[in-house]
Amino acid sequence: MIWIVAGLSVLIVIIFIIVNIKDNKNCKTNQIMQAPLTDGNVSVFMDNNGKIDVIPFNFNKLKQGRASDFPLTIMKPYTQDDVGALIREGLKLSGSEKSLSSKVLMEALGFFDWKDYSKGRKSVSLTCKKQEIAFNSTIRRSDGSYAFRVRGFEKVLPAKLSNYELGNEVLNMIKLSI
């Protein structure tokens, strides 16, 4: 009888250990660290259906932003990891020497002009520089342009974010956009 109780106790302990190990692995899968983010700039746009466009851009000599590559797009369903990976790719592309005209950018997005494209879309702007990434949620103006909600950077984090953390941060910031 005592052997049965001892055996059951050992079995319960083993099951408890296995369950805890599996739970810890699931927690850590969302926190896998990536290489630090590449210096660059992207604007992230989300429409009413949850479709996300990431537009890589760089600045000209007059400090005007211009798309530096074609937009990257992801449709629902997606995870924070998926969104973070797309933004990471956009940051890499922002360093390209390309410079897309507004016409080419609008054709790639499937719209005639910026005002039409921006209607109903929320936006977050990201700038990664010197191992920091700055986030700014925006307010859409009546002419279709966007302005930062706050002066300066709304949030600054170290550039050593996992795709999950990056995607999660952007999805939370986009909720603040108007």
Regions found by a protein language model. Name each.
Residues K25-P36, E89, L93-T127:
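Intrinsic disorder/low-complexity detector
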Residues I2-N26:
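N-terminal signal-anchor transmembrane alpha helix of single-pass membrane proteins
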